[in-house]
Amino acid sequence: MGERARSPDIEQGKKGGKHPYSHYSSDLGSSPQSSGPSSPVNTTPCASTREKNPKRHLSDNQVHHPTVRKVSPKAVPSKKGIRVGFRSQSLNREPLRKDPDIVTKRVLSARLLKINELQNEVSELQVKLAQLLKENKALKSLQYRQEKALNKFEDAENEISQLIHRHNNEITALKERLRKSQEKERATEKRVKETEGELFRTKFSLQKLKKISEARHLPERDDLAKKLVSAELKLDDTERKIKELSKNLELSTNSFQRQLLAERKRAFEAYDENKVLQKELQRLHHKLKEKEKELDIKNIYANRLPKSSPKKEKEIERKHVSCQSDFTDQCTKGVQTAEDFELEDFPFTAQTVLCYENRWDEPEYLSSYLEYQDLNKHGSEMLSSVLGQEGKYDEDEDPCSAKQEARKPESEWAREELDKVKGKSALLGRAEKLALEAGRFPTENYQAQSVDKFEDEAERLKTEMLLAKLNEINKELQDPQNLGRAPLPLLPNFESKLHSPDRSTRPYSFPESLDRSFNGQHLQDLSFLTPRGEGGSPGPIRSPGQIRSPAPLDEFSFGSYVPSFGKTLGKSNPPSQKSSLLDFQSNSSESPSKDSLDLMSRKEKKATLMEQLFGPSASNTSVSSKSTDPHFPAASRGDMDPLHFLSGDRNSRVREPGDEEEDLFLREGRSFNPNRHRLKHASNKPTVTAVDSVDEDIEEVTLR
């Protein structure tokens, strides 16, 4: 196609080229230079403009190209005819034109070549344009198809969420349908089971009815109905009883719980109160120890030791043999099991109190240790006043025998009262016994106010009795001729006052505890088992007959002052004490030769009184001088004798009462606690020992 378009142009150029040549040739002579250079100048801008604006040139070619291709064939002959006519005219006009020069030809040929080249380029560009148009059209169609597919894909992607939502809705609907179907299935299975159970029961009842219908030995229906009614009534009664019993059980359980709580509370309160009382007991024990120390310092009767005669010592040894059996009986009867006095693992310490002569004494006769301390100074003054008048008067032994006969009814009455007290104490429970043994009086009597009142009143009574007795002694000393009247009892009787209504509930009552507490574990001294001598001193051990017959009450009614003799504390020189003691004994031994027998009997009465007031140690000053008297009252009574338990080889040396008591510990008291805190006498002690200690002048009993 391009070749076809190119060929007419070439042909046209060739034809046109002939005419210009002819035209140029005709005008060559007139304007050869102007025409020559003008043509290249005109062609050059065209080429340059085409190169600068190829797009515009292409568009122009695209516009004018169809017109060139569609030139009718009729136009060609017209042009040819015109050209021919022009040619013919030029030939006719210039028949004799000269040939152009060579330069012009060359320029023209160059212009022609250039035109041909440009035409070739135009044709090539047109071909390329046609190809590009085809390609553009194909790309547009492809783009359209791609856009259509893309729109279709986007629509499908937007529908995915809706599709998922619809799918979820379908799943929910299917699950709901499945649940309903399962419920229906379960309901159906339940109905089937109920139906099967009903069928089974129906079959069972049918079989039972068949058996009943076949049974011939059954009673009538009315009897069976009555039995059924009675069985139902019994069942109802049984159920009602069960309910009542369960209710009663619940109520009883609640009441028992309340009672148990109350008992526990009471037990805790008792436990706390017991602890308080134990602390108070310890405090009193420490206070008592302090009082003992003070008494040890204030002792004033350490060196007044008499020397007993050999005849008296033999008599004491003979009585000691008879006392050993009774002492063994007391030890046997006084044993107390550990179960009776073990109280809450509390280690009770031994409490030091004054006890009376023997186990037949009334519990009211027990007095506290504090009374002794209060009356210590007063008793020492009375002792000095009585000893100053000791050698002036004398008295026969008849009043003493009359005095003993007057005291027998009182002793029997005391035994009856003691039996009553023992009978009452036997009825006490174990807890009350423990309370009586531990505190010696009920818990409420531990109050300080009542105890102080009782102690004050007891002190006042003791003082009155002591003053009355001293006045009586002074009267007897001033009136030695008045010997026929009956003597006063050595001490006033406390019985009526202690048994008065205001004294009926007083403490200090433990008649059995004295016998039971002698188990060898908490014993601190022997004298609480040894029946007292007169005056509440560490008295001698009586013979069995004397122990079974209680001593007169007046002999041991004064139990607050108990002087005795212990071991020396190193306050004085032992040799000087020995010499002074020997001098004192020699003077006392010479007294029978200087005084008459009446004076000896009166001195014996004084010694008995001093023994009652201050213990046997006070009256021992005249024992050695009067031991030869066969009618000696003290020998008949035997109250002071057991203090001088001397062996056969010790008759020649002087022994003090503390030594005799210590020997008694060594011989008879092997069951005692070996860890006693009392001072022991060595086996090789000197012949005469003067002591200042008061460790032995207080009788101790363990308060359990």
From Swiss-Prot:
Tissue expression per record: Detected in several tissues.
Deletion phenotype: Deficient mice exhibit retinal patches of depigmentation, lack rod and cone ERG responses to light stimuli, and show loss of ciliary intraflagellar transport function in photoreceptors leading to failure of outer segment formation and photoreceptor degeneration.
Biased composition (Low complexity): 25-40, 617-627
UniProt entry tagged with the keyword Acetylation: no
Biased composition (Basic and acidic residues): 1-14, 49-63, 404-417, 496-505, 592-608
Chain positions found as Phosphoserine: S7, S48
Function noted in UniProt: Involved in intraflagellar protein (IFT) transport in photoreceptor cilia.
Protein name: Lebercilin
This protein's encoding gene: Lca5
